[in-house]
Curated annotation (Swiss-Prot):
This is YcgL domain-containing protein ECA2367. PANTHER family: PROTEIN YCGL. It comes from Pectobacterium atrosepticum (strain SCRI 1043 / ATCC BAA-672). It holds the Pfam family YcgL. Transmembrane segments: none annotated. Gene3D superfamilies: YcgL domain.
Length: 85
C-alpha cells in the first residue's frame, strides 16, 4: 500500500494523505477549500513500515481504506506561560 502526501499552503504543518497521486475525489469539498492548493510532499510506501514521524500508521491505513484520505494536523500548542500554584 502506498500513500501520497500533500502539504497545505494555507495551514502550517497540515498534511493530506491520499491513495493515488492527484486523486482528491474522496476528499470533502469543504476540506479541500480550507486546505488550499495541495503541494506534493512525498510518495510513501506503507507496507512493511512500522511507524510514521507524526501520525499513527494504523490510523492512516484505516482512514485511507475507509474514507480515502487522512488529514494530519499539527499538535496543539502548549502554553508557554506558567501560572503560580
Amino acid at each position: 500500500m502506498f500513500c501520497v502526501i500533500y502539504r497545505s499552503v494555507k495551514r502550517d504543518q497540515t498534511y493530506l494523505y491520499v491513495e493515488k497521486k492527484d486523486d482528491f475525489s474522496r476528499v470533502p469539498e469543504e476540506l479541500m477549500k480550507s486546505f488550499g492548493a495541495p503541494q506534493l510532499a512525498m510518495v510513501l510506501p506503507l507496507n512493511g513500515r512500522k511507524k510514521l514521524a507524526n501520525a499513527d500508521i494504523e490510523k492512516v491505513k484505516l482512514a485511507l481504506q475507509e474514507q480515502g484520505f487522512y488529514l494530519q494536523v499539527p499538535p496543539p500548542v502548549e502554553s508557554l506561560l506558567t501560572t503560580p500554584v
